[in-house]
Amino acid sequence: MFILYPMLQKSTSHSKTNPKSVPVREWAYNHLKSDVLSGHFNPGERLTEEHLAKALGVSRTPVREALHKLASEGLVQPLESRGFCVARDSLEEVEDLFDIRAALEGYAIRLICDCISEQSLEELNGFIEKAQDALNRKALDEIFEYNTQFHDALHRVISGKTRFHSLIADTRKYVLRYRKDSLYYLDGAKRTIDGHRKILLAISLKDPDLCERVIREHIREAKEDALHKITEDIKAS
C-alpha cells in the first residue's frame, strides 16, 4: 500500500565526452542544443565558435554547423558582428509554451491517474523527499535535478504512448530554460516541491479531475514565475 509521507550552483548534467559511435557534428549539435534548452546558456548570451570549440574539445567546423542548425530552429540568432547569441522569446511566446504544456500535461495526468502503479508512486515520493532534503541543505543544484526526475518518472508511466510522450518531452525541454530561474532561489524551489506533493496526493486519491486542476495550477505558477523573471530582465537591460 502506498503511503504519502509527511511534508518534510548551476551545472550541466550531460557529459562532454563524445561517444565514439556518434558523429562529431551530431554530438556537437545535440550538446549545444541541450545547453540552450536547459538554460545553461542564458537568453541573449553571446556564443562564439572559438570558445565553444575549445570547451567541447572539437574543431570549429562542427560547432559552426551546429550553430547554423540551431539558428534555423530559432534557438540562436546570428549577430551583425561575429558569432551568435541565444534567442530571446517574447513574453507571448513564453506564455504560449507554458499554456501548451498545461494542456498536454493536464490530459496526460488523467491517463496517469488511471494506470500508475504503487511502485511508481513510491518512486515519485522518493524524488520529493530527496528534493526536500536538498532544500533543507540549500543545495539548489540537487533540487533542480530531483524535480526534473520527478517529472521524468511521472511521464514514464505513459511512455507506451510514444508520440504523445514525445510531445510532452519536447515541450518540457523548451520550457525548462525559463523554469530553471525559479528553482534557483529558495522560495521558488519550496513552492515547486509543495506543488509536487499536491500532484502526488491527487494521483494517489485516483481523482482525475483533481489531478488535472492541481497540475494546471502547478504549471500556472511556473508560468507566472517565468514571466516575472523575463519582465525584470527586460527592465534591467
Labelled PLM ranges:
Residues 1-114, 119, 163, 212, ...:
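Short linear motifs at protein or domain termini
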Residues 1-3, 188-237:
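C-terminal regulatory/effector modules of DNA-binding transcriptional regulators
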Residues 23, 121-122, 187-190:
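Short helix-capping and inter-helix turn/linker motifs at the boundaries of alpha-helical repeat units
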Residues 27, 65, 107, 111, ...:
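Residues within well-formed alpha-helices
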Residues 72-77, 171-173, 187-190:
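Mobile beta-alpha loop/short-helix "lid" or hinge segments that flank ligand
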Residues 81, 104, 126, 191-194:
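Alpha-helix N-cap/N′ positions at the starts of helices
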Residues 93, 97, 118-181, 194-202, ...:
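Conserved amphipathic alpha-helical segments that form helical-bundle/coiled-coil interaction surfaces
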